[in-house]
Design a protein with these regions (language model features):
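Glycine-rich phosphate/diphosphate-binding loop of Rossmann-like nucleotide-binding domains
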Residues: 1-67, 72
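Rossmann-fold NAD(P) dinucleotide-binding segment
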Residues: 66, 79-95
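Glycine/threonine-rich flexible loop motifs
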Residues: 77-85, 109-114
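Rossmann-fold NAD(P)-binding glycine/threonine-rich loop
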Residues: 89, 93-130
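A conserved FAD-binding loop/helix module that cradles the flavin
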Residues: 140-149
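Internal hydrophobic alpha-helix adjacent to the cofactor/substrate pocket in enzyme cavities
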Residues: 153-163
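Flexible, glycine/charged-enriched surface loops at secondary-structure junctions
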Residues: 161-174
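Conserved small/polar residues in nucleotide/adenosyl-binding loops
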Residues: 180-187
Length: 191
């Protein structure tokens, strides 16, 4: 039996974990991202049949039609997800292949994706099963809450224990999620 061929679009948290999970199940995994720096940062933790490649339109056109599973995990903070896979690519996939569009909360990154629900999670389009449930973590609220807490708790404890300025000095990544305000900005008399 040949290993499943999995194409993961996006090397963020979701894409990286999906790729690692598929590789641990002996799938042949191609992880694509547009950032060579992001892909390089993941190299040390790569296992099994997982290859990472800088994404391009031509590469997608070659890989998607041959995939057994395509996972769309791109994230555009504050915006709509780019459509990376067009209907023509989906039409070329083998019947029974599967698409999971995690980016559906941002409009989806697969042209044929339509939001589905936890009660009716899949739809078949061009012979390909699509799973595009919005708020996927909602299916496992306890587990997703534990995961969120495990990631955010160190930051919360750092801010609570040392104050914001020292926490930002120790963890500069906090700067990207701070909203700066001043008393002058809250002056409603000047509006």
């Amino acid at each position: 039996v040949r290993p499943a061929k999995v194409v993961v679009l996006g090397a963020g948290t979701v894409g990286w974990n999906a790729a690692r999970t598929a590789a641990a199940m002996d799938a042949e995994v191609l992880l694509l991202d547009r950032s060579p720096q992001r892909l390089r940062s993941l190299e040390a933790d790569r296992r099994g049949r997982l290859m990472s490649v800088v994404s391009s339109r031509g590469l997608l056109e070659r890989l998607v039609p041959t995939a057994d599973l395509v996972i769309g995990a791109v994230l555009t903070p504050g915006g709509r997800a780019p459509t990376l896979v067009d209907a023509g690519m989906v039409q070329q996939m083998r019947a029974g292949s599967v698409i999971v569009d995690v980016a559906i909360d941002q409009g989806g990154c697969i042209a044929t994706s339509r939001e589905t629900t936890h009660t009716d999670p899949t739809v078949t389009i061009h012979g390909v099963q699509h799973y595009a449930v919005g708020n996927m973590p909602g299916a496992v609220p306890f587990t997703s809450t534990e995961a969120l807490v495990s990631v955010t708790l160190p930051y919360i404890l750092g801010i609570a224990g040392r104050g914001l300025e020292e926490a930002v000095t120790e963890r500069p990544e906090l700067l990207s999620c701070l909203l700066y305000t001043s008393d002058a900005a809250d002056d409603t008399d000047s509006v």
